[in-house]
Amino acid sequence: VAEFLDLVRISSPSRREGRVARRLVSALQALGARVEVDDAGARIGGDTGNVLGKLPGSAAGAPPLLLCAHMDTVVPCETVRPVVEGDVIRTDGTSVLGGDDKAGIAAILEAVRAVREAGIPHGPIDVLFTVCEEQGLLGAKHFDTARLSARRGLVLDCDGVNELITRAPAANSVRVTVHGLEAHAGLCPEQGISAIAVAAEAIAAMRLGRIDGETTANLGVIEGGLATNIVPNRVTVRGETRSRDLASLEAQSRHMRRCFEEAAARHAVTVDGREHRARAEVRIERSYDRLEVAEDASIVRLLRDASARIGRPLATRATGVGCDANVFTGRAGLEVANLACGMRAIHTVHEWVDVKDLVGTAELLVAALAVNAAQTA
């Protein structure tokens, strides 16, 4: 708990995880890990790279296991003042808490410390703390998985407890630039095409929010205009769509594109004998692939055995959010699931965690490391 409180007090927004990274390098070295920091930060414009700690195993022949969490948090996170009320740790209402994902980091460090101090046999452990997860899993995307010894593992990055996320959506980013025509808003507005009005028309016609049981869509940023007395000639819109069903993902992506293109096609003006038409540039790209881990996969069996060892039921479920496991699963033969680690009300200033959940997550990791030690590579 003390370690979690120390971590959340360190500001670490995306691309500025340097302070917490240095703290974690020292913590891993104190546990006996060989620590490397890669160049992901330089490639994405950040102040540090991904932190990888490699701990040797104490059980001969046991397979390596990956434990991963991300260092960055969403904003506001500049001054986090955690409030402890009994077993609950929450924010003071002015910032996020940072349990997403420092709850995962704290659980990993505590579990590794516990097996080392108690002399519990374990296989080699790869501990990976990534950067810029909150900005499209960028740290994981820029991490060279060939540096890992483990072929299976756990990302700790989900709300809830005693749950293993085995299914998560793929996501497409949606970036749109709507071009109109500027004009004086008071003198000759009929000679302009408002890019904001075109975008508004497109958005009004668009299906957003919960599309179906597998699919969501959101437009989260809109920017445009220079002054109130100018008909705006340009507006940009940024959003996303996610789905665990790839056909639905592509259908929603086409729908969003069509709404912008059709709205633009309806707007044209003629000025001094020349026709001007609105135009929508729509760019849709895959942000990350879906997570699909089979119910009989070895990492799922490992967690079920670990849960049984400590007398707790483990549920597997789907989620609507992506994480670093989306990047690692299936890449270079890795098998990675997402273990819930007790974070609650994430991405809000009402975020909180229960100390019992932090402890319980660490206990489950200790059990997983012990069960893994009895297996052979």
Give a label for each model feature:
Residues V1-R15, R286, R344-H347:
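N-terminal capping segment at the start of a domain
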Residues A21, D47-N50, K54, A60-P124, ...:
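Active-site metal-coordination/substrate-binding segment of hydrolases
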Residues V83-V96, T177-A183, I310-G311, M343-H347:
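Glycine/charged-rich beta-loop-alpha catalytic/anionic-binding loops adjacent to active sites
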